[in-house]
Design a protein with these regions (language model features):
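Ligand-binding clefts/hinges and TM-proximal coupling segments of bilobed small-molecule sensing domains
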Residues: 138-154, 232-264, 303-306, 316-320
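Short amphipathic alpha-helical segments at helix boundaries and their inter-helical linkers
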Residues: 79-83, 174, 270-286, 313-322
Length: 326
């Protein structure tokens, strides 16, 4: 009986992964630049259950420390696509660099400000005059600036220090900075290592971060069918996560070597859904104005961010997920 049930289970899994996208054409390779974090859940599930290959896509991964590093790799043609925040796409648009957002694959609330209590920091007001670590050109600088503004301060009233995104725990534990802005799972790691030696605040001030899959106009124009095939695979992964959250969590745990407690904590802080909606545009405009206000660009006006979003791919695969007002 046990053997019979096991065979049935294998058949059901195989049916789920194959019936969604039987593909008899040429399988093409797509190189994706990514930071290995749980925000990539749709990507990892699609890879694990062969949704990519069943739709004619062979995905290979190249790891980067940050989304901005992944996009820089994209622009250097090291990869075909990059996973990044909308903030990076905003920055590239203000630099007149061609990067298009294909779809949001996750909305999250995973960024935090972590401060050392032995530096006299008990409230956010105590951050004034302190050295705060933020990885260069990432969305952490925006979140820090916004949080300071909401607490009556300006980012010029702190000293920002360009820190390595790969080792925030070492940076704050080593005492090079008084505080740091970082994201999960590093936040949990620092909390476990330093305990009461740090105080932690949410950094995003209620604004979700959009984790996007991006590419260049050149590559998209050369591979429109491949874009649709990849997004179709992610739509199938989204359906799988909705129907089988426990199995999806196990995939993340195996892939990223995460424990049960961590996954249980952060799962609800993510929305693993494909989308292109108006809230993305509003966030990009807000971030663009912030960059201009803080002289992080030579531009004086924000661009039309619709010019940096490619809607045709997602419209073809999941039209109800496109909710942008033109």
């Amino acid at each position: 009986v046990t053997v019979f049930l096991a065979v049935i289970l294998v058949m059901l899994i195989g049916s789920f992964s194959c019936s969604k996208g039987d593909y008899s054409g040429k399988v093409e390779t797509v190189a994706i630049g990514a930071t290995p974090i749980e925000l990539n859940a749709l990507i990892y599930v699609a890879d694990e259950y062969r949704f990519f290959t069943n739709n004619g896509v062979q995905v290979v991964f190249k790891d980067y420390d940050t989304g901005v590093a992944a996009v820089d790799g994209l622009l250097k043609r090291e990869v075909d696509m990059a996973l990044t925040t909308e903030f990076v796409i905003v920055g590239k648009s203000l630099q007149k660099q061609d990067v298009l957002d294909l779809a949001t694959i996750d909305k999250s609330m995973l960024f935090y400000i972590i401060a050392r209590t032995d530096r006299g920091i008990k409230t956010t007001a105590d951050l004034k005059g302190k050295r705060i670590g933020v990885p260069r050109q990432t969305i952490t600088g925006f979140y820090l600036g916004r949080m300071l503004e909401l607490n009556g301060m300006r980012i010029q009233q702190v000293t920002t220090v360009d820190t390595k995104a790969s080792d925030p725990a070492g940076t704050i534990a080593g005492g090079d900075v008084d505080a740091i802005v970082t994201w999960e799972p590093q936040v949990t790691q620092i909390r476990q290592q330093m305990g009461n030696g740090v105080i932690i605040w949410p950094a995003q001030s209620g604004q979700v971060s959009f984790w996007s899959i991006a590419s260049t106009p050149r590559w998209i124009n050369q591979h429109p069918d491949l874009v649709r095939q990849l997004l179709k695979s992610l739509a199938q992964a989204e359906e799988y996560i909705i129907q089988h959250p426990a199995e999806a969590k196990k995939i993340l745990q195996r892939r990223l070597k995460l424990d049960d407690t961590y996954i249980a904590t952060v799962w609800s802080q993510n929305q693993f859904l494909l989308s292109l909606d108006q809230s993305l545009i509003l966030a990009m405009e807000d971030e663009g104005r912030w960059m201009i206000k803080n002289n992080l660009t030579r531009e004086k006006q924000i661009p039309d961010f619709m010019n940096y979003i490619y809607v045709d791919g997602l419209k073809a695969v999941k039209p109800e997920a496109v909710k942008i007002i033109r």
